[in-house]
Amino acid sequence: MNHIFKVFLVIAVTSFTSSLLAQDTTSDGGAKAYIISPADGATVSSPVTVQFGLSGFGVAPAGVERAKTGHHHLLIDVEELPDLNSPIPGDEHHRHFGGGQTEVTLDLAPGTHRLQLLLGNHQHVPHNPPVLSELVTITVE
């Protein structure tokens, strides 16, 4: 009986480890995320519509594991990037678009805001290398 438990434990640990390793979705470095609108340096009024762009990859909803795809995460006023080896957090500074959305309308307070896109795989983990847009800085009046 003890031997059966050990075999089961080895199988369980191996399966768990394999699922963790599967989260590391590679990109070929040719994919590019970008913010279509608003433009860097733009002065806008709230609400602000942010349009997402992606080339060299496709958009797929969270939970759908498909090569060369992912879904957008909008980083709003973050001081540093999240851990690129873990799922992207979900909070007011890290907005998830797991349904495959390619734009959002945000209510932003007056002032300067920094926007950046980070593509996540089916489990919200960034690709390797990360598919990350340039930082866009806007001013909301």
Model-flagged regions — what are they?
Residues L81-D83, G120-N128:
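Short acidic/polar inter-strand loop motif in beta-rich domains
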Residues G53-V64:
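Short amphipathic, basic-aromatic surface patches that mediate peripheral association
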Residues D24-S45:
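Short, compositionally biased P/S/T/A/G/V-rich stretches that sit at domain boundaries
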Residues S46, G70, A109-G111:
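A glycine-anchored, Pro-Gly-centered beta-turn/N-cap motif
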Residues V64-H72, L132:
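Short coil-to-beta strand junction motifs in C2/discoidin
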Residues I88-T112, L118-G120:
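Short, solvent-exposed, Trp/other aromatic-anchored flexible loops in extracytoplasmic proteins
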Residues T17-S18:
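N-terminal signal peptide c-region/cleavage motif recognized by signal peptidases
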